[in-house]
Each structure stands twice: as C-alpha cells, then as structure tokens.
Amino acid sequence: MSPVLRLAIDAANFPRDRRGMGRLAREVLRTALADPAFEVTLLAAKRSDARALRAEFGERYRAAGPLSARKRRAYDAVWFPWNGMRFGCAAPSLVTLHDVFAFSEPHRERIARRREQAPILRAAREATRIATDSTWSRDQILATFAAASGKVEIVAPAPSTYWSAGSGDVLPPQVAAGRYVLLVGAREKRKNARTLIAACAAALRGDESLVIVGGLGPEDRALVLRSGLRAGEIAASDRMLRALYRNAGVVAVPSTAEGFGLVPLEAMACGAPVVASDASALPETTGGGALLLDPYDVPRWAQSLRRLLDDPPRAEDLRARGFARVAALDRDGFTRGTLESLRRLATRDENFVDRLA
C-alpha cells in the first residue's frame, strides 16, 4: 500500500484572497483534506493567519511555518497557489502561476515592483514544475524566463458548479434585473474599464446602468463622473455575485490582458450573455461562447451592448453559446490536475520512493 503523501501548501493568502485565485485554491485544499491519501500541512507565518485558517478549515490539517519546508524530509511535495514562490523548499514543488503581468506590466514604484516580481522570479528559477492556465500564459512565461523551459504545464481552471443559472435572487435595490451591464474586477489598468465606461456612456439609456463589482481606480471613477453615466460600485459576496451574473443584461470583460479569465466562464455558467476582448487568453478561454471585440474599439462596444440589450433573441443566442462552452469544460479539472501533478512530483522523489520500500 502506498504511503500517505505529505503535502504542504503555502497558506499565506487564504485569509485574504476570496476571488478567482482564492476560490480555485480552496477547492484544491478541501479536496485534499477530504482524501485520506494526503496528509496536509498549511504553512503560515502569522499567528493571525493561523487562527483564520483554523476557523475556516477546522482541525483536519497540520500547521507549520514556512521555514519547515526547508527540511529535506519534512514533506513529499509543496504547492504554491498564489502566483509565485514566496520561500524556498527542499521537497519537489509545484507553483501555480496564472500570469507574469508583474513583468510585462511592472509597477511604477521600485519597492512594489520588486515585491511583486520576486516570487515569480523564484518560481521560474527554483520550482520543480510550474502549472499555468492557458496556452497564452504558458507562452508568456516561457518568453519571459528561459529558466522555466521544460517545466511548464497547463492546468486549466473552470468555474465550480456553484456558478449556475437560477432564479429567485435578491438584487441590490438600485439594480434592475436585465437592465445593467456588469463589470467584475476593474481596478487594474489592464482590466480596461475605460473602454467600457465610454461605451456604456454612449449606449445605455433610461434606467440602464453599469454595475462594477470590486471597485474602480480613481481615474476611472473620475471618468464615470465626467461622463454622467449611471453607475454603481458594489462589494459583492459570492452569493451576490452569482445573482448579479444571473440577472445581467450583459457581462463585459474588456481586458487588454488576462492569463485566463475566470469571470467570463462564471458568467456563462450563470446564463449571462458575455462580451469580451479578443486579446490575450480570452479567445482561448471563452471558446466561442462570447462575442469578442477589439478592446480599444469604443464605438463597436457601444453598438454591441445596445444590440444585446434591445434584441432578446440575440442575447438568448449568446447565452446558449455560453452554456455550450461551459458544458464542454471539466468543472473539476483544475483540482484534479493540480493534485495529480503533485502526486507525480512526489512519486518521482527519492524520499517518497524510500518510504515505499
């Protein structure tokens, strides 16, 4: 009988990250905790993080600090889910690297730039394997880091079954079902909120509005005020976000760069018509389930939004395309692929092989 695989996971961001990356990591962790083939240790340096982890995940795991990963026989494999490798480790390591935007679109401030780039650079140099989300992101990693050659694999995410069509949702009082364009996660420049704000200002009428989940940066917020656009920013729980997806007239993803793009797939799974940029990984991710547009073509965005809001059969056709795209995905593929990669790493390691003897 095979020994239990001693899996350590960098847990630093679990208490803070509940967005796409955090949701994916939680699914992997919960699956590993429920599988007797794994003995899970969560690595967290801060006491406050350790308390938060116990509150969320109970007593089913061991707890340790990151320094324990440097001991040669402490673990059979270490997983770094947070887009980089924060510390070194002696065991075989898998780093999930969603993107390298810290290098292609570096922060203007030197200290912040180094803080964002250092874990990615360490991953490229030291990780045993790197898992990324798409062909596009793999190519970006390999073009940026020669050291990553030969160790990058694709483990594509998919929305969990939580994201599904339904009815009976309660929306915020200022939001009218079917009468809004939804934008999720807009603070970063590459999210390109500017194009959508200008398009909505030209296209929306009457009680129609732009709803933003996750907030805008100060420049984009000023642009909304100058345009006179009816818009609202909402801090949404997963339950509220699902309700907003289900009832949106259109979900818009105008990003100029995405390593994958989970938002359009979540929206499709919930039955929303999706309009997305034709840039970076989004054509690969949406797979024919979205209307794709040049991210800088404001008139085309305005025209497309107006047509979808005015033409229910057109919107219904786009919904059907979205459902078909999601149906073709392996909804558990990211979790299974990540754990299989970790098993392969461990079973090739001499320490794990010694324990088989």
Predicted regions and their residues:
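Carbohydrate transferase catalytic cores enriched for Leloir-type hexosyltransferases
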Residues: 1-357
